[in-house]
Design a protein with these regions (language model features):
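Active-site cofactor/cluster-binding pocket
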Residues: 4-7, 11-22, 26, 99-109, ...
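A structural signal for alpha-helix termini and helix-coil/disorder junctions
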Residues: 34, 64-68, 271, 275
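C-terminal non-catalytic interaction/assembly regions of soluble proteins
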Residues: 1-51
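Short, surface-exposed amphipathic charged segments that create phosphate/polyanion-binding patches used
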Residues: 2-3, 53-63, 237-242
């Protein structure tokens, strides 16, 4: 460690109740024990409650280190209103390269959303000169739970090893989520929002939460609705809405020409479902064309 280092923050992705500190923090403290001019060492926790950190949280760690008396035993990523150990992320930082498209997809476990998004990454990575990145978060249920896909596409290398906190495009594949989750959190001004819903335009106006309508209006969000469930049932796909929503994504997001996207999606269908027979392939192709 250079002599110029005066303070060190150690982050552990664990919580050790009853211990004087977390494992990595104790290792670092032990390494400097008894050394002359040892730096000040503070420890913190991250990733608690499945709340992964983003650049704003890391900036808060540096701000804490810069204080005259840095807080020890802090947490980042959550709001700790019980023991008040959390650091407040004051800076809203977007560290992705300029021109990068960030897209979030809220899906239902087993509806095919994650698989379709993995195909989208492969399509863009294989057929364009763009870089692609994908992260996928799940809840604890094997099927029927919530899935959130985080995709980034751009002309420059993407070095953002964290979930999306600033999105250009958000898709919600289950209309009930608009009541349960803040699906539009982090959507940029002039962004796009695609909602899969059985509601008519009049019902959308009536049933969409007021806070969501306010956000859409104030941030000039392009709002699209699609009844993918009805289309899937008419085609014979049941609840598998993934290819319908994926085709809509390529149409709205305008990452690659939609004609090329449809061609590549149909190639991906053959790769993914070819072994299940021509009927299944044709149904998925019909879903893309719909």
């Amino acid at each position: 460690i250079p002599d110029t280092v005066k303070k060190i923050a150690v982050l552990d992705k664990t919580k050790e109740p009853g211990s004087i500190g977390e494992p990595l923090y104790l290792d670092v403290v032990r390494a400097f024990y008894g050394k002359e001019n040892a730096p000040m060492i503070v420890g913190g926790r991250f990733g608690l409650g499945s709340k992964d950190p983003n650049p704003s949280h890391i900036a808060a760690v540096y701000a804490n280190l810069n204080a005259d008396e840095p807080k020890n035993g802090f947490t980042i990523g959550i709001v700790d209103d019980v023991t008040n150990t959390s650091l407040v992320a004051t800076d809203d930082i977007d560290a992705t390269p300029e021109g990068t498209k960030a897209c979030k997809f809220w899906g239902l476990g087993s509806d095919g959303t994650v698989g379709a998004n993995k195909s989208a990454i492969k399509i863009i990575g294989d057929h364009t000169d763009m870089y692609a990145q994908g992260y996928f978060s799940y809840d604890s249920k094997k099927s029927g739970g919530i899935t959130v896909s985080h995709l980034r596409f751009g002309k420059k290398p993407i070095k953002s090893p964290y979930l999306i906190n600033k999105a250009d495009f958000v898709a919600c594949h289950n209309q009930s989520y608009v009541y349960k989750y803040d699906v539009l959190e982090g959507l940029k001004k002039n962004g796009s929002f695609l909602l899969n819903t059985i509601w008519t335009p009049e019902e959308v106006e009536e049933k969409l939460p007021a806070s969501m309508k306010k956000f859409i209006a104030e941030n000039n969000i392009s709002f699209y609705t699609l009844n993918a469930v009805k289309i899937a049932q008419e085609i014979g796909l049941g609840g598998r809405i993934n290819m319908i929503m994926q085709a809509a994504f390529f149409k709205i997001a305008d990452i690659i020409p939609v004609e090329d996207a449809i061609k590549y999606l149909k190639q991906a269908v053959v790769t993914s479902y070819g072994k299940k027979g021509e009927k299944v392939v044709n149904m998925n192709n019909a879903a893309i064309d719909a």
